[in-house]
Amino acid sequence: MKSPKIKNNKMKQTDKTNSRENIEELEMLNIGMVGHIDHGKTTLLSKLTGKFADTHSEELKRGITIKLGYADTIIENSKGKKRYISFVDCPGHEMLMATMLSGAALIDAAILVIAANEGIKPQTKEHLIALKAKRVAQIIIIQNKIDLVTKEEAIKNYNDIKKFVKGTIAENSPVIPVSAQQNININKIKEILSELKIPERDTTSKPEFLIARSFDINKPGTKIENLHGGVLAGILKKGTLKIGDEIEIKPGIQEKHANQISYKSLKTKIVSIYRGTHPINKATPGGSLAFETELDNILTKSDSLSGTIASIPNTLPEITNKIKLKYSLFNEVLGEEKEIKIESLKLSEMIMLSVNTTTTVGKITRIKDNEIELSLNIPIVPLKGDSVGIARNIHNHWRLIGFGEII
């Protein structure tokens, strides 16, 4: 479905400080902001970028991140080295673990925020393991809110953090004392960000664009001739896409016929591409991206296409409700104050899976050794080798209990 009269009406550029060429030449990183609720992730992000990632009224009212927030910036270190950084602000609330896992699927490295006045919380542990499950190895630990504690308390908290990460993927990660509110050590964080390793990017394979958000950017009352098409936001996992390319989105939209639910893929054309507020001609892996398309906005408003995948038409696997995983479980439930031992998966058990930017619930239909087969409530695009977070409903909350890989 197409939106009327948008082909020559590209999204308005709001920041003209950099040309297309400059932006496309910069090294790019996706950084996840993770940690317990109210430890200062969003405030820290505002100091690093000059903007808040929370843009939803419900989030501003409640003071917590509910959906994934995004903020892009160009950082420059003391030697004049520049990088383009896309930050993904992941929810820290225990009931929003699925959204956090979706965010972890998008990132190259992470900033783990721990408040010095509160210390290590259950969600801190859960998020650290989630990063491991999503194969995120580069982590910067921020000891935030040092202005709220004494010197002795700060030293004790620092030692607690070092003890906490010993034996984990973050054992050798730097721990930076910070006060986001007072702008203490913000430049030190930027220095470290400028030196993180850039992952090897695959620009030659068929593209896989992971859609985390979708929007209608038109204001009420916009004249037809000024309408923009639906916007898709996320990251390009591999391949390249350029203005004018036709893309196919799967699973697409849900259709219901005679009480039977099916999914129909969507085909559209890329009208313009933005990295943050900067227009670019061609999208490559690294950094968050927004594609304006020819889709009718009714299909993209309110994140209705979040969790889908886009590529060149007829290149993605067929969607499926049946998948097979190789899996591994943790010893105990993370994110709980008291220890809860994780029991083995059971036949017919319902578990939640986080696959790239989507989540779905599935019923276990077969178990053999460390492999399971599931029947899913919502179909996925099965990309072999993709990491999958596994969660179980414990005390009415979905808790991360392990991870797997699509086989």
Locate the predicted segments by residue.
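N-terminal pre-Walker A segment at the start of P-loop NTPase domains
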Residues: 2-6, 11-16, 385
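P-loop NTPase switch module centered on the Walker A-proximal segment
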Residues: 10-98, 107
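C-terminal effector modules of nucleic-acid-centric enzymes and ribosome-associated factors
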Residues: 30-33, 149-151, 297-407
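Residue-level signature of catalytic and energy-coupling elements of molecular machines
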Residues: 38, 44, 63, 89, ...
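Conserved Switch II/interswitch segment of TRAFAC-class P-loop GTPases
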Residues: 90-95, 105-127, 134-155
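Conserved catalytic-core segments of large NTP-driven translation/proteostasis enzymes
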Residues: 163-303, 309
